[in-house]
Amino acid sequence: MTKSILFLSVAALLLPACQAGEKPASNTAAANATADLDAGADEQAIRGQVDHWLKLVKAKDAAGIAALYAEDGAVMPPNGPIGKGHAAIQQTWAAMMGTPGFDLTFVPEQILVSSSGDMALDRGTYKLAVAPNGTAQTDTGKYVVVWRKVGSEWKAAADIFNSDLPTSGG
């Protein structure tokens, strides 16, 4: 009889604990739904930044492009040094866009927003045309931009890209 009372007492104590454990699951579901909505809004905000970036590229506005980066942001072009900070980023972009025939487009293929909502990864492809010696050359490649939320605005923290073309000289 003592064992039965003990068992019922333990069961009576555990039942409310189990029911309380169910409530966070519904709260978690609500939090996940809110996070999904926020991630969707954040993805759209980043796509807006990408669209703005493309307009600045067409206008060859290196200062405007540099402003899209975080203060401590970096651009990492192929075959060149890392440009850290707004001044170096502006200089890097100005040099690239100063190439005769420069035309660049890029398309995000995937944007992943962190569960914390303050970082995101943008992976995509680009097409580049230049004519440095009067002869048109084209390139296709891929890029990764790591975005950081600064206040309410998304800024590029790191930007790296490279060609799909084979290197010359084998």
What are these regions (language model features)?
Residues 1-7:
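Bacterial N-terminal signal peptides that target proteins for export
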Residues 93, 108-113, 126-128, 142-148, ...:
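Hydrophobic/aromatic beta-strand elements that line small-molecule binding cavities or substrate pockets
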Residues 19-68, 170:
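Short, low-complexity N-terminal intrinsically disordered segments enriched in polar/charged residues
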Residues 21-24, 140-165:
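Short beta-strand edge/turn micro-motifs at domain boundaries
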Residues 15-17:
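C-terminal motif of bacterial Sec signal peptides marking the signal peptidase cleavage site
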Residues 118-128:
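A short hydrophobic beta-strand element
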Residues 40-45, 62-115, 137-138:
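A solvent-exposed, acidic/Ser-Thr-rich amphipathic alpha-helical stretch
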Residues 113-120, 147-153:
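A short, structured loop/turn motif at beta-sheet edges
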